[in-house]
A protein has these predicted regions:
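Alpha-helical scaffold segments that form or flank carboxylate-/histidine-based iron centers
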Residues: 19, 50-53, 115
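Hydrophobic ligand-binding cavity/cleft-lining segments
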Residues: 1-42
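Tryptophan-centric aromatic hotspots in well-structured domains and transmembrane helices
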Residues: 24-27, 36-37, 70-72, 117-120
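Hydrophobic-ligand binding "helix-grip"
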Residues: 34-43, 48-101, 105
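A conserved amphipathic terminal alpha-helix motif
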Residues: 105-143
């Protein structure tokens, strides 16, 4: 597992012992995102509403080649996220698993960098666990 930040992006790489199709399902469906991050509701064909406590965020989910991209459309809980993009690049690793390259474009330039880095560093292993076993660690992360 590797985490890096550049001038504008937060990146995290990890190996998932599941197929890239399982990883894709985990980041594109209501059930998938709810299983590793926060309770999620599908809104139309390409949108997800993710509930975080009394607030939440709206995502447009789209494919860009083999990657899945979340465009953050609204985020009252973390307004600086609006306009950022989250990319999940899942590729077969040649050993029956998946190499997942995660990028939150624009995050490193935001005031929430420290808190958000800790959050993604907690939730990405939860995503891997969900894809591997069907059980992640959704909801508020331990402090």
């Amino acid at each position: 597992m590797t985490t890096t930040t550049t001038a504008a992006d937060f990146r995290h790489a990890l190996r998932v012992r599941a197929t890239s199709a399982a990883v894709r399902e985990a980041v594109t469906t209501e059930q998938g995102v709810s299983g590793w991050w926060f309770p999620t509701t599908a809104v139309g064909v390409d949108r997800l509403h993710v509930r975080m406590g009394d607030s939440g965020l709206e995502l447009r989910v789209r494919a860009e080649g083999d990657d899945v991209v979340w465009d953050v459309l609204d985020c009252p809980v973390e307004p600086d996220w609006v306009g950022t993009r989250v990319r999940f690049a899942a590729r077969p690793d040649g050993e029956g698993g998946t190499a997942l390259a995660f990028t939150h474009h624009g995050l490193a330039a935001l005031p929430c960098l420290e808190v958000c880095t800790a959050g993604w560093s907690w939730y990405l292993p939860s995503l891997a666990s969900y894809a591997e076993t069907g059980a992640g660690a959704p909801g508020p992360r331990p402090r």
